[in-house]
């Protein structure tokens, strides 16, 4: 009898230990996942600066709804400048050592420029209304990098090289880090000269990026959200629901609940247009997947459909700007 009671007691203890171990393991997995997300470094892409492209005549034009706009021709630059690929590769190695993941700029630009002629506008399936995107906007959206690194350099008369390194948030185009310097005179090839000159500045450059990204983790990433009405729709943002709330108020309430810390700024508004700037969105969703402006705007589009029974279309310009146009697809 005593042996039986002892066996039951031991079984109970082992069961409790198993439950506690499973619970602790699940908790640790959850903590590790959150820690991993917070410690994850942003994804980078390196491109030559606009000034570098302009000085070497690597420029192209694109049609922004009837207006010709100049933009760097990255595809031609990669094809014709023999040193560019090696410069970017060497800089990429320095940044990889700092823990960053890099997107292949040359391959991404090849893929994008193949379809620029047909994809440089997004339009309404109903009325044919359009929104234009620059080649760089398209590269950002396709590559989905967090940070764009641009490099510029000049070889001096004494065979030293002066460089400028800048980092831009791909979502807002804000400059978030910069480094400049001049290397020692050298007879090395340009890519090696640049690498040696940049090495002494890379730690501080990395620190600036980390500080910015830590702020994004804490306070959310900025995007721009525009709400418009199709011209052939008979409603507007001042139309009221059954509770007497205008459509613009319904949208603002949703943003207060879904933006990080309810942070956004209604910069401009009319009955047919609303511009929300400094909208803070989380870097990742609950599953750990990265969120961009389209993802966030799509959630709002679904909410407008559910609450107001209104059809709308989400369009984007790059990663950090979304436009919701209400009234049709």
Predicted features and spans:
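Bacterial Sec-dependent N-terminal signal peptides
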Residues: 1-27
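C-terminal/domain-edge helix-coil "capping" segments
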Residues: 24-57, 175-263, 317-318
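Extracytoplasmic
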Residues: 39-41, 82, 86, 90, ...
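N-terminal segment of the mature soluble domain
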Residues: 58-133, 141, 245-284, 288-305
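Short, flexible helix-coil linker/hinge segments at the edges of structured domains or between repeats
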Residues: 107-126, 168-189
